[in-house]
Amino acid sequence: MDIVEEILKLKEERNAVILAHNYQLPEVQDIADFIGDSLELARKATKVDADVIVFAGVDFMAETAKILNPDKTVLLPSRRATCAMANMLKVEHIIEAKRKYPNAPVVLYVNSTAETKAYADVTVTSANAVKIVSKLDADVVIFGPDKNLAHYVAKMTGKKVIPVPPNGHCYVHQKFTIEDVERAKKLYPNAKLMVHPECIPEVQEKADIIVSTGGMIKNACLHDEWVVFTEREMVYRLKKLYPEKKFYPAREDAICIGMKAITLKHIYESLRDMKYKVEVPRDIAEKARRAIERMLEMS
């Protein structure tokens, strides 16, 4: 059985579209109809002309697609495709922060569960967080769940950003250290460093540019050699888009297990058996949709 051929056949039969995040396995990226970062995928989800969305990403991304497309079938090919950071933020953290800062808007990174998004005034991605927080008429904002992105937003906007929970982080980006920066500069003296804002502040300070994965794609044209401080598969995406340039992963072990839980076999089985259907309770979806749509309007 040629699995790629079978997927394409099923895709046509089901009137399905495959959306994939930049961190997906190369072979999954190759079969996707659209590849992007969280913001690009959220935007794309609102414009999809298909009955079925197969989401090659992690659970919160598939939830966002379902919230924006309540009448479409959204499939997450593997139940193991989950985000540890999104699960760090609980509703109780938000309620507690609101008690202390009753006038502060709640700004949630899209890397959060649908349940917590229902408590957000607006959601953000790493691509638009600074822009959106700058536009808010507030000097203090509650921000979760990534403390490193919260630090970056505070630095760029001059606002007081309260991280919830205090230690929320992405385990992949938390791995990058100053030693990785020094090694990269030694190994690739002509390269510049592109750093994701989920990295720790000390690494951010050494960056030539601090950008989302979508920003990495847009800015790669500025230089011929880059060391990439984000999930390893982003290097595959960049090399494919810019074959004439050189890209190096800052760490070979910067791997998101949740993203790698989806293989071609999972996508094939997902389309064959129409599994696993993503459902979001209506009351939660309606509240979360307001926060997501506000983000899309503001960015």
From Swiss-Prot:
- Which residues of the sequence carry a binding annotation for [4Fe-4S] cluster? C83, C170, C256
Quickly give the catalysed reaction: iminosuccinate + dihydroxyacetone phosphate = quinolinate + phosphate + 2 H2O + H(+)
The coenzyme or cofactor needed here is: [4Fe-4S] cluster
Which pathway does it take part in?
Cofactor biosynthesis; NAD(+) biosynthesis; quinolinate from iminoaspartate: step 1/1
Q: Does the keyword Secreted apply?
A: no
Cofactor comment text: Binds 1 [4Fe-4S] cluster per subunit.
User: Any idea which UniProt keywords this protein has?
Assistant: 4Fe-4S, Cytoplasm, Iron, Iron-sulfur, Metal-binding, Pyridine nucleotide biosynthesis, Transferase
Q: Name one GO cellular component term.
A: cytoplasm
Q: Which GO terms describe its biological process?
A: 'de novo' NAD biosynthetic process from L-aspartate
Q: Top-level EC class, please? A: transferase
Per the UniProt entry, the Enzyme Commission number(s) are: 2.5.1.72
Output this protein's name. Answer: Quinolinate synthase
Per the UniProt entry, what species is this protein from, by scientific name?
A: Pyrococcus abyssi (strain GE5 / Orsay)
Q: Which gene encodes it?
A: nadA
